[in-house]
Amino acid sequence: MIDVAAFIGPYPFRALPHPEPGVLERVLQREGLSGAWVGYLPSPWQRDPAPGNEALFHALEGHSSLRPAPVVRPDWPGWREALDQLVVRGAAAIRAYPMHWGMGPHSPAMRELALACAEAAVPLLLTVRFEDLRQRSALDTAGDLTAAHVRAIARIGAPIKLVVTGAGRELLEETHWGLTPDEQQRVHWDFAWIWGPPEDHLAHLFRTIGAERFVYGTHWPLRLTQNPRANLDLLPAELRARGITDASSLAFSVGKTPT
């Protein structure tokens, strides 16, 4: 099982203990995970994603279980060439942060990025939030990703693979039930921010939208890696047998040339 929502690097708003690839590998082994799609934590707050991407690839050298999930900003010069190069270098997914870049739900730039990712057969990964509003720094002014952003990309119609991390039950249901069945199949969600017992939001969603719509994400080092595993273990017995999707089935092999 792959963790789709892990990060390395310093967090701009508070100190995090050991946000390093070697520590992440040990954490994944402890949790019984085979690898992770890894982002560079400072990147959402940097205008130019290129330096952060280079730092990410450099840091992950020698860590074969950690695959880079770099950032492509579709309003930045040369972004298409950058996307092709990142895919060839082995990017497992492409991250985008429309809320941090001031892009609305129907941004033409985000549409172009989604189409380019579909053409390159690489998942597009969106993050709803990094921290709860109650603990978010006043300097972090970006709002949470909206359901309208997710629906707009899912409705494009191309063979898009969209992975959304950090959503709660409300945003997930607002998005999912506003899509056609075909559009729903283009979106996968992690469940790190979805409540288990006693609210049992995860069990409800497994029953209503299906376990196969979910992938595994920890949001390390911002959140405890034990939370997703505990939520799965605390599901009712009849739901524990329903398997979530392994995100490794959504990404292509390292070094594939984009079509």
Each language-model region and where it sits:
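Mid-to-C-terminal alpha-helical segments outside catalytic/metal-binding sites
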Residues: 2-13, 17-35, 84, 204, ...
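Active-site neighborhood of phospho(di)ester-bond hydrolases with catalytic His/Asp-centered motifs
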Residues: 2-4, 37-40, 69-71, 95, ...
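Active-site environment of divalent metal-dependent phosphoester hydrolases
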Residues: 9-11, 43-46, 75-78, 101, ...
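Short, flexible/disordered intra-domain loops and linkers
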Residues: 13-17, 45-47, 133-145, 229-230
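Structural motif corresponding to alpha-helix initiation and N-cap regions
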Residues: 18-22, 50-53, 76-80, 107, ...
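Alpha-helical scaffolding segments of alpha/beta enzyme cores, especially the outer helices
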Residues: 23-26, 54-58, 81-85, 111-119, ...
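Active-site gating/metal-coordination segments in enzymes
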Residues: 34, 47-132
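Catalytic pocket-lining loop regions of alpha/beta-barrel enzymes
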Residues: 93, 106-215
